[in-house]
Amino acid sequence: RQGEKNGPNIIPHTWVKELVEKDLSDAAIVETNTYYEGDRYTTEQHRETLKVNGWTFCPVDILDENGTTMFPVKGGKWFTEMSVGKDLADYDSLVVLTHFKGHTMGGFGGSNKNIGIGCADGRIGKGMIHTVEGSDNMWSISMEELMERIAESTKSVVDHFGEHITFVNVLRNMSVSCDCEGCAAAPVVTPNIGIVASRDILAADQASVDLVY
């Protein structure tokens, strides 16, 4: 996910443009709208943010622009299904390109957080993850419960794509703040490390954590 307007730490769009033009000419970037009100809350706002941040070199599919669909969650503690952007079901493969960083509630933002939050649609799915019974405050959920819910959302997507999904974490400009904080993100103090790639999401995120700590 690309973060808010002019976010200082996101993956440079020129890197992704070169990758797409060289190796993924038929690819589209996929996004969903946010649950909180910001630069990506509505599809119109989101497309303007994409333009400001330079993501205009290939098609961008805002997955929940045309509605939602449900993916099953197998063996879930919190969910039996997860609401994702409707258009996600139109794809037969997924490259999960993630800017690895910190996250106030999730501990860190890697491939798991990118998919779990990033594929859930902006109104229903993200609400299922962020809110608890009896509260409309998205921040009242405990960190442990939020992380479990994110993981279950992620599992629904990973199970859907099966062998046709791969994970790439970019360990660069790693603030303790999520990219959703945009220009308000805390200053970067961690050295740039490199890029981690795997077809195993747990391996990708664990290797990233190990390299940072």
What do these predicted ranges mean?
Residues 3-213:
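Extended, low-polarity segments enriched in aliphatic/aromatic residues
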